[in-house]
Amino acid sequence: MSPKTIVFITGAFVHHSCWDEWKKYFERAGFNTLAPPWPFKDASPEALRNSHPNPEIASNRLATLIDHYERIIKQLPENPILIGHSIGGLIVQVLLQRGLGSAGVAIHSVPPRGIITFKASFLKAGWGPLGFFTSTKRSFLMSFEQWQYAFTNGMDCEAQKEGYYNYAIPESKLIVRDTLSKAAKEIGRAHV
């Protein structure tokens, strides 16, 4: 029997409503879909931005986020198809390693630990979110200029503004840092 449930996993800095059009598409094709928010992020993008700096969001860690999605998946009647973007793509890989998905799609995934680039563009985009030399008790909210550079550099200015208003939210610096830790390491299960 083919799975009929899809779980969408959001990346960092982006509200889970970014999956709304994807959900509609797959629901029209007969799938059940979920796009659960990350812990402490079940509010509108505007409300989350207005809550910045948010110590609860700042406390999120990659391992607890992976466990959050594991709990959601284990409550489902079947192993779902997993689709994730960025850190969500990395989470998809880890969940598949744990046998918690029937299939997975990682869109522009953050790579597992041990795979890194030192390109200037990557370092520029990642320096602020990594939050070195700043308090990890404060969430990080990209400025519009950082959003333009790191997320929407191929879009016209109006689309960039719309994307920022509709989707940009504060993030935990610890989650971004954790992508460099053992929490982000694949454990070697076969890939197809």
Mark where each language-model region is.
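Flexible "cap/lid" loop of the alpha/beta hydrolase fold
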Residues: 101-136, 175-183
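Gly/Ala-rich beta-loop-alpha elbow adjacent to hydrolase catalytic centers
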Residues: 83-88, 92
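Alpha/beta-hydrolase active-site loop
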Residues: 53-75
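Glycine-rich His-Gly loop
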Residues: 8-12, 86, 109
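Active-site signature of alpha/beta-hydrolase-fold catalytic machinery across serine-
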Residues: 21, 94-95
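Short, surface-exposed "cap/lid" segments of acyl-processing enzymes
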Residues: 3-47
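Conserved alpha/beta-hydrolase catalytic His-Asp/Glu region
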Residues: 141-176
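Conserved small/polar residues in nucleotide/adenosyl-binding loops
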Residues: 190-192
